[in-house]
Design a protein with these regions (language model features):
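Glycine-rich phosphate/pyrophosphate-handling loop used in enzymes and phosphotransfer proteins
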Residues: 1-240
Length: 240
Protein backbone atom coordinates (compact mmCIF):
# COMPACT_ATOMS: atom_id res chain seq x y z
CA UNK A 1 0.00 0.00 0.00
CA UNK A 2 1.16 3.52 -0.78
CA UNK A 3 1.04 4.77 2.82
CA UNK A 4 3.25 1.89 3.98
CA UNK A 5 5.80 2.75 1.28
CA UNK A 6 5.74 6.39 2.40
CA UNK A 7 6.38 5.38 6.03
CA UNK A 8 9.29 3.16 4.93
CA UNK A 9 10.81 6.02 2.94
CA UNK A 10 10.48 8.33 5.95
CA UNK A 11 12.06 5.83 8.39
CA UNK A 12 14.73 4.26 6.19
CA UNK A 13 15.38 6.96 3.60
CA UNK A 14 15.45 6.48 -0.16
CA UNK A 15 19.10 5.44 -0.59
CA UNK A 16 20.09 1.83 -1.08
CA UNK A 17 22.18 0.55 1.84
CA UNK A 18 24.15 -1.59 -0.58
CA UNK A 19 25.27 0.80 -3.32
CA UNK A 20 24.23 4.14 -1.82
CA UNK A 21 22.25 5.15 -4.89
CA UNK A 22 18.85 6.75 -4.65
CA UNK A 23 15.98 4.47 -5.61
CA UNK A 24 12.19 4.54 -5.51
CA UNK A 25 12.08 0.74 -5.42
CA UNK A 26 13.72 -0.19 -2.12
CA UNK A 27 12.42 -3.26 -0.33
CA UNK A 28 12.99 -1.48 2.10
CA UNK A 29 16.79 -1.32 2.26
CA UNK A 30 18.16 -2.51 -1.08
CA UNK A 31 17.56 -1.56 -4.70
CA UNK A 32 16.61 -4.36 -7.14
CA UNK A 33 20.21 -4.72 -8.38
CA UNK A 34 21.57 -5.18 -4.86
CA UNK A 35 18.79 -7.64 -3.99
CA UNK A 36 19.86 -9.76 -6.95
CA UNK A 37 23.49 -9.47 -5.87
CA UNK A 38 22.60 -10.53 -2.33
CA UNK A 39 20.73 -13.58 -3.60
CA UNK A 40 23.71 -14.52 -5.79
CA UNK A 41 25.96 -14.29 -2.77
CA UNK A 42 23.57 -16.52 -0.84
CA UNK A 43 24.46 -19.27 -3.32
CA UNK A 44 28.00 -19.09 -1.89
CA UNK A 45 27.00 -20.03 1.66
CA UNK A 46 29.96 -21.35 3.62
CA UNK A 47 30.71 -24.22 5.97
CA UNK A 48 33.88 -22.99 7.74
CA UNK A 49 34.09 -26.28 9.68
CA UNK A 50 32.11 -29.50 9.83
CA UNK A 51 30.05 -28.03 12.68
CA UNK A 52 29.57 -24.46 11.43
CA UNK A 53 27.37 -22.89 8.75
CA UNK A 54 27.40 -19.33 7.43
CA UNK A 55 24.58 -17.97 5.27
CA UNK A 56 26.76 -15.60 3.21
CA UNK A 57 30.43 -14.93 2.46
CA UNK A 58 31.75 -11.56 3.58
CA UNK A 59 31.58 -9.27 0.57
CA UNK A 60 31.30 -5.46 0.31
CA UNK A 61 27.49 -5.74 0.18
CA UNK A 62 27.09 -8.12 3.12
CA UNK A 63 29.65 -6.14 5.13
CA UNK A 64 27.53 -3.01 4.73
CA UNK A 65 24.39 -4.89 5.79
CA UNK A 66 26.09 -6.40 8.85
CA UNK A 67 27.32 -2.90 9.71
CA UNK A 68 23.74 -1.63 9.44
CA UNK A 69 22.55 -4.42 11.74
CA UNK A 70 25.17 -3.73 14.41
CA UNK A 71 25.82 0.01 14.27
CA UNK A 72 22.97 1.77 12.46
CA UNK A 73 20.17 0.52 14.69
CA UNK A 74 18.48 -1.65 12.07
CA UNK A 75 17.73 -4.89 13.97
CA UNK A 76 15.31 -5.96 11.23
CA UNK A 77 18.32 -6.56 9.00
CA UNK A 78 18.78 -9.94 10.70
CA UNK A 79 15.46 -11.31 9.44
CA UNK A 80 16.02 -9.61 6.08
CA UNK A 81 19.30 -11.48 5.56
CA UNK A 82 17.84 -14.79 6.71
CA UNK A 83 14.91 -14.28 4.34
CA UNK A 84 17.28 -13.81 1.38
CA UNK A 85 19.54 -16.71 2.37
CA UNK A 86 19.35 -20.40 1.50
CA UNK A 87 18.56 -21.49 5.04
CA UNK A 88 15.38 -23.25 3.88
CA UNK A 89 16.28 -24.21 0.31
CA UNK A 90 19.64 -24.79 -1.33
CA UNK A 91 22.75 -26.42 0.08
CA UNK A 92 22.38 -25.04 3.60
CA UNK A 93 18.78 -26.19 3.82
CA UNK A 94 19.88 -29.66 2.75
CA UNK A 95 22.60 -29.69 5.44
CA UNK A 96 20.16 -28.63 8.15
CA UNK A 97 17.61 -31.24 7.08
CA UNK A 98 20.08 -33.95 8.16
CA UNK A 99 20.30 -32.69 11.76
CA UNK A 100 18.10 -33.98 14.60
CA UNK A 101 15.07 -31.79 15.24
CA UNK A 102 13.87 -29.64 16.87
CA UNK A 103 16.45 -26.86 16.57
CA UNK A 104 17.36 -24.81 19.65
CA UNK A 105 18.96 -21.55 18.53
CA UNK A 106 21.21 -20.17 21.27
CA UNK A 107 22.44 -16.60 20.63
CA UNK A 108 25.95 -15.58 21.65
CA UNK A 109 25.21 -13.33 24.64
CA UNK A 110 26.15 -9.66 24.56
CA UNK A 111 27.79 -8.04 27.56
CA UNK A 112 25.53 -5.65 29.48
CA UNK A 113 27.71 -2.66 28.53
CA UNK A 114 27.38 -3.46 24.82
CA UNK A 115 23.66 -4.08 25.21
CA UNK A 116 23.13 -0.68 26.82
CA UNK A 117 25.13 0.93 24.03
CA UNK A 118 23.32 -0.85 21.18
CA UNK A 119 19.88 -1.46 22.66
CA UNK A 120 19.64 -5.04 21.43
CA UNK A 121 21.72 -8.15 20.86
CA UNK A 122 22.12 -8.79 17.13
CA UNK A 123 22.73 -12.50 17.79
CA UNK A 124 19.28 -12.75 19.40
CA UNK A 125 17.71 -11.13 16.35
CA UNK A 126 19.50 -13.65 14.12
CA UNK A 127 18.42 -16.56 16.34
CA UNK A 128 14.79 -15.39 16.22
CA UNK A 129 14.86 -15.11 12.42
CA UNK A 130 16.41 -18.57 12.04
CA UNK A 131 13.93 -20.10 14.46
CA UNK A 132 11.03 -18.58 12.53
CA UNK A 133 12.41 -19.86 9.22
CA UNK A 134 13.03 -23.41 10.43
CA UNK A 135 10.35 -23.97 13.05
CA UNK A 136 12.91 -23.94 15.86
CA UNK A 137 13.07 -22.21 19.23
CA UNK A 138 15.25 -19.47 20.71
CA UNK A 139 16.88 -20.56 23.98
CA UNK A 140 19.04 -18.27 26.13
CA UNK A 141 21.21 -21.07 27.43
CA UNK A 142 24.45 -19.05 27.58
CA UNK A 143 25.58 -16.17 29.76
CA UNK A 144 28.57 -13.91 29.30
CA UNK A 145 30.59 -13.53 32.47
CA UNK A 146 33.32 -11.16 31.28
CA UNK A 147 33.73 -8.19 28.96
CA UNK A 148 36.34 -8.72 26.23
CA UNK A 149 38.03 -6.33 23.83
CA UNK A 150 37.04 -6.31 20.16
CA UNK A 151 38.16 -9.47 18.39
CA UNK A 152 38.58 -7.87 14.98
CA UNK A 153 42.28 -7.01 15.03
CA UNK A 154 43.45 -10.09 16.96
CA UNK A 155 45.14 -13.22 15.64
CA UNK A 156 43.49 -16.61 16.01
CA UNK A 157 45.48 -17.42 19.15
CA UNK A 158 44.80 -13.99 20.64
CA UNK A 159 41.09 -14.38 19.90
CA UNK A 160 40.97 -17.73 21.66
CA UNK A 161 42.71 -16.36 24.75
CA UNK A 162 40.53 -13.25 24.67
CA UNK A 163 37.26 -15.21 24.94
CA UNK A 164 38.47 -18.23 26.92
CA UNK A 165 36.07 -18.78 29.84
CA UNK A 166 34.03 -15.73 28.79
CA UNK A 167 30.80 -17.76 28.70
CA UNK A 168 28.96 -20.11 31.04
CA UNK A 169 25.95 -22.31 30.35
CA UNK A 170 22.55 -21.37 31.77
CA UNK A 171 20.66 -24.58 31.10
CA UNK A 172 17.12 -25.35 32.27
CA UNK A 173 16.61 -27.88 35.04
CA UNK A 174 15.33 -30.43 32.56
CA UNK A 175 16.96 -30.59 29.13
CA UNK A 176 15.20 -31.85 26.00
CA UNK A 177 16.14 -35.42 25.12
CA UNK A 178 16.51 -34.83 21.39
CA UNK A 179 17.29 -32.07 18.91
CA UNK A 180 20.21 -29.85 17.90
CA UNK A 181 21.58 -26.81 19.71
CA UNK A 182 22.73 -24.18 17.21
CA UNK A 183 24.82 -21.31 18.58
CA UNK A 184 24.14 -18.18 16.51
CA UNK A 185 26.21 -15.07 15.87
CA UNK A 186 26.69 -12.45 13.17
CA UNK A 187 30.21 -13.19 11.84
CA UNK A 188 32.39 -16.31 11.85
CA UNK A 189 36.10 -15.57 11.41
CA UNK A 190 38.35 -17.95 13.33
CA UNK A 191 35.60 -19.59 15.39
CA UNK A 192 37.11 -18.42 18.69
CA UNK A 193 33.91 -16.87 20.07
CA UNK A 194 31.51 -19.62 19.01
CA UNK A 195 34.10 -22.22 20.04
CA UNK A 196 34.18 -20.75 23.54
CA UNK A 197 30.38 -20.93 23.58
CA UNK A 198 30.41 -24.60 22.58
CA UNK A 199 33.00 -25.33 25.28
CA UNK A 200 30.70 -23.77 27.88
CA UNK A 201 28.25 -26.64 27.38
CA UNK A 202 30.87 -29.16 28.47
CA UNK A 203 32.09 -32.42 26.99
CA UNK A 204 29.15 -34.51 28.21
CA UNK A 205 26.41 -32.31 26.79
CA UNK A 206 23.78 -34.75 25.46
CA UNK A 207 22.53 -32.84 22.39
CA UNK A 208 24.26 -32.24 19.07
CA UNK A 209 26.02 -28.86 18.92
CA UNK A 210 26.36 -26.71 15.79
CA UNK A 211 27.08 -23.08 14.87
CA UNK A 212 25.28 -20.81 12.41
CA UNK A 213 26.28 -17.24 11.53
CA UNK A 214 25.09 -14.73 8.98
CA UNK A 215 28.46 -14.36 7.26
CA UNK A 216 31.87 -16.00 7.09
CA UNK A 217 34.87 -13.69 6.95
CA UNK A 218 38.28 -15.03 5.92
CA UNK A 219 40.68 -14.38 8.84
CA UNK A 220 43.21 -12.78 6.47
CA UNK A 221 40.69 -10.12 5.43
CA UNK A 222 39.26 -9.38 8.88
CA UNK A 223 41.54 -6.40 9.56
CA UNK A 224 40.66 -4.84 6.20
CA UNK A 225 36.99 -5.33 7.06
CA UNK A 226 37.58 -3.66 10.42
CA UNK A 227 39.10 -0.62 8.69
CA UNK A 228 36.17 -0.50 6.25
CA UNK A 229 33.70 -0.74 9.15
CA UNK A 230 35.40 2.14 10.96
CA UNK A 231 35.33 4.24 7.79
CA UNK A 232 31.61 3.57 7.26
CA UNK A 233 30.90 4.33 10.92
CA UNK A 234 32.78 7.65 10.68
CA UNK A 235 30.97 8.58 7.47
CA UNK A 236 27.61 7.75 9.05
CA UNK A 237 28.29 9.72 12.24
CA UNK A 238 29.59 12.72 10.28
CA UNK A 239 26.20 12.94 8.57
CA UNK A 240 24.32 13.23 11.87
Amino acid sequence: MRWIENVERFVFGSECLGCGKGSERLDPWLCPDCVRELEREAEECRCPTADAYSLFPMRPLTRRLIHALKYREIPGMASYLVKHSRVVGGMLGAELSLLPKPFYFVPVPLHRARFRERGYNQAEKIASALALATGGRVCRWLKRKSFVVSQTKLSKGERERNVADAFVSALPGELPTRGTVIVTDDVYTTGATTGACLNAFGRDFPLMLKVCTLVYDEPASAVADYVADCRMDWEYNSEL
